[in-house]
């Protein structure tokens, strides 16, 4: 509910602050006094785009601020919480429009975009009578109002959940299909996998194969080296290592009794001869193992060639081929499972579509019943409001495609025939602001008691009417004010007299510049204002008495 409105340097307003309470608040004043500036200010606080022309002449910027009590307004609280802009039970909207054309907006003292301001405002205030900012002109808002009237929350939630589930499954399937044709990919990888599986790719085996290749490739050199080394260690001549060691050992044995340390040298020489013997034994074994086999060497080289070719193909080393083979096998298995998963997804998508259709059918039946009831009730109210022969039709139109839609299987269009014999036209195409306001009023009254926006603003609802019809309009607005906060700009005394609170806007010259001023009227001032609205500038006793009678009738309601 709107609690406080501040308007500064806006159009012809220098600075006004208004307090609002529950019920119906009326705003009256002479033509050109600036009555609609309050509604304009709320419009800009609701996200309407503005230019520098709204800034008061001579000022640098216009400042607008509105404070709302959202204690019991669930939708606004949820919206604020979802975007992390909540601040308890209060909500402040603020807008600055600069003379250079710039503009900034805040929600609860935090900067926001105009889009965010507009989104939140749809949960706080609804302005009727201005084409560019009337919620009921939106087909989506019409659908929401119809569902609210039908109390379809459970059915609509079921449809939304079913559509969301269907879309999630579809997205999952699309993501899998985006990876390409599974069968082609599987065939390609399986061909490569077969090539890898023909070879023994064990890293230890490949390492041993490389070692064997090196031996085979250098067998002749190895044999020659073994022969030469054996000859050096134990040849037939006196220069072999083993012969020289024996000679040295013999020389020391003849003199070792003269120096005990020579015994240690003899021990070392004995060990050296033992090691030479062991080396000769190993050399003989290696020599016997070394056989030149050209066929074996060729076979080894062919196998190594295949391994290196596979390694180049898969961009890895031969030792990494086993890991590559395992990865590819896992990928094939995964893709085979993916193919099965796609089939399962298709089945689940079909089931999700069936569930959505079932939920949407229930919602459609409820909407059809509600549309007929709301049309009848609103049509009666339209006629009461002076639009004789007017008729509201609520048309349910199927969506152009069969895809599950979160809002159900149909769209809504409110059609209005304002005069007998005229074909119904979409509500959004009504040219007359007064007719549009009265139709909106009738729809709102028909939906009394339902959970809609807390603050409703009406402008031009009394255009082109008077007398008994004006009295009916006032009664309907007051009845609406029992359920919601209503702000109504009016020039009809019958409507003004029905308000719970009454403000008067007037023009005052200050330093040769016309400015708008607004004041809250007490009972006496209110009677004077209604008398002025009845009789003009010169208030007669009859007008004063008639004003008193209108206010007395209000007390008796």
Swiss-Prot record:
Keyword Transcription regulation: no
InterPro entries: DNA_recomb/repair_RecN, P-loop_NTPase, Rad50/SbcC_AAA, RecF/RecN/SMC_N
Pfam families cross-referenced by the UniProt entry: AAA_23, SMC_N
GO cellular component: bacterial nucleoid
Top-level taxon: Bacteria
GO terms for MF: ATP binding; ATP hydrolysis activity
GO terms under biological process: DNA recombination; double-strand break repair; SOS response
Keywords, alphabetical: ATP-binding, DNA damage, DNA repair, Nucleotide-binding
Protein residues bound to ATP: 29-36
Membrane-spanning residues: none
Purpose: May be involved in recombinational repair of damaged DNA.
Similarity-based family: Belongs to the RecN family.
NCBIfam families according to UniProt: PRK10869.1 (NF008121), recN (TIGR00634)
Name of protein: DNA repair protein RecN
Source organism (scientific name): Xylella fastidiosa (strain Temecula1 / ATCC 700964)
Gene label: recN
